[in-house]
């Protein structure tokens, strides 16, 4: 399932966990990263085999944590925080603006596969609210105008 480099990373990771099932969360992160930001049925089965646990157990863990995705995200995955600190300074309005601008709702990906939007409860950037994450990059004090510029910049980088 993994490339040669990914397999080496997997082996390094497993060497830190004498009990294989304890590596479940890091393995899910690795599998998701190596699979373009989401967990396929194949990757879930592979992780279950490595950890020597059932696929049902792995699926239960995936459903508990919001950071694991079962659908392929857009090339640019916009995670918009709507926790109280962000909402107090425009987080909900920013989410609505972004949905309107891209013509998609939170939890979905545009037909062209370029953007996906996810509403987040908290991304740990309360001091810089409203905040968003694009893929793995944080953007702080985002407003509708700066979101429009960000979307334009990303759109010009297909």
Write out the residue ranges for each language-model feature.
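Signature of N-terminal electron-transfer/Fe-S-associated modules in redox systems
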Residues: 1-158
């Amino acid at each position: 399932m993994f490339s040669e480099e990914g397999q080496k990373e997997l082996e390094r990771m497993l060497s830190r966990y004498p009990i294989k099932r304890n590596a479940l969360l890091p393995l899910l992160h690795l599998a998701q990263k190596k699979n373009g930001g989401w967990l396929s049925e194949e990757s879930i089965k592979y992780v279950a085999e490595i950890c020597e646990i059932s696929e049902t157990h792995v699926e239960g863990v995936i459903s508990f944590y919001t950071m694991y995705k079962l659908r392929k995200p857009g090339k640019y995955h916009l995670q918009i925080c709507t926790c109280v600190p962000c909402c107090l300074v425009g987080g909900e309005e920013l989410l609505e603006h972004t949905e309107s601008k891209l013509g998609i709702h939170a939890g979905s990906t545009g037909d062209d596969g370029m953007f996906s939007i996810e509403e987040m409860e908290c991304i740990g950037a309360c001091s810089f609210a409203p905040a968003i994450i694009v893929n793995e990059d944080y953007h702080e004090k985002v407003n509708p105008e700066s979101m429009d510029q960000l979307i334009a910049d990303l759109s010009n980088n297909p």
